[in-house]
């Protein structure tokens, strides 16, 4: 199910693979997980930021947005990751602030923020006799909740050959390579399979059913399409199936329905079918 992945270009921050023996439904959900589900750290301008500013042109809200936009090149953690910016401009000229003016700490201990070159906190000039002091604590989140947590990009293109794709991942965070992101996306997909299986296990108890409707959270429509495709194409189960389709999303419902119909003389019940399909995806 995972296909054959061969690296065409392999850089620290971007990798391109030639992917064979899989299907667009699979590479598409891997792409979606990378764009939506991979967690990272970001500063929060709400209850995690304390700003003491004197004689500044910018408002505190504007300052908070500039700090919030700083990329954090440190793995997501539940420990306290903090930035402190405390500067007084005693010169006669305006001073533009960078990450070199900041101190980064993890649980109170100074850490390297891993910026190759100082990252400009722009536009945030500090004029003569102006002072700024900011203390901000990072929070962990996912891109699907807020774009500031996005830690990379990913996409794919189909080749002329059937089910052959050029798939690429670009990392925006220095603590992880594209290959790390691919591995993490696959682990998240495994978790999605198991969480969904647990949510529908009660629906699968009746071994005599010849048709069944299984709900999937409507935010997981790509997952639903992947399951539908595998049910129809998996050689271990497709001979047992007459029909399988995803019903259109009803805006009044919170789920997508996967409708499955199996053959009357089938020796495999729905519980076995779904289990085989999910194991094939992983």
Predicted regions and their residues:
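Protein-protein interaction/assembly regions in multi-subunit complexes
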Residues: 1-282
């Amino acid at each position: 199910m995972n296909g054959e992945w061969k690296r065409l270009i392999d850089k620290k921050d971007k990798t391109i693979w030639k992917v064979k023996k899989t299907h667009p439904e699979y590479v598409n959900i891997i792409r979606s997980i990378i764009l939506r589900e991979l967690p990272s750290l970001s500063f929060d301008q709400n209850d995690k930021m304390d700003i003491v500013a004197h004689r500044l042109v910018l408002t505190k809200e504007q300052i908070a947005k500039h700090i919030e936009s700083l990329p954090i090149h440190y793995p997501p953690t539940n420990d306290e990751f903090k930035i402190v910016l405390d500067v007084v401009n005693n010169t006669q000229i305006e001073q533009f602030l960078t990450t070199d003016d900041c101190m980064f700490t993890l649980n109170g201990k100074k850490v390297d923020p891993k910026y190759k070159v100082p990252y400009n906190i722009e536009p945030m000039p500090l004029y003569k006799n102006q002072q700024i002091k900011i203390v901000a604590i990072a929070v962990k989140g996912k891109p699907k909740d807020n774009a500031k947590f996005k830690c990379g990009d990913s996409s794919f293109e189909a080749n002329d050959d059937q089910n052959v794709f050029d798939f690429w991942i670009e990392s925006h965070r220095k603590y992880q390579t594209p290959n790390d992101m691919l591995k993490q996306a696959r682990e998240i997909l495994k978790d999605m399979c198991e969480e969904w299986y647990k949510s529908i296990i009660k629906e699968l108890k009746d071994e005599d059913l010849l048709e069944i409707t299984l709900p999937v959270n409507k935010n997981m429509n790509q997952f639903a399409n992947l399951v539908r495709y595998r049910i129809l194409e998996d050689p271990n189960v497709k001979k047992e199936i007459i029909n399988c389709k995803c019903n259109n999303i009803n805006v009044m419902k919170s789920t997508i329905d996967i409708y499955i119909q199996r053959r009357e003389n089938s020796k495999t019940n729905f519980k076995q079918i779904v289990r085989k399909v999910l194991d094939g995806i992983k």
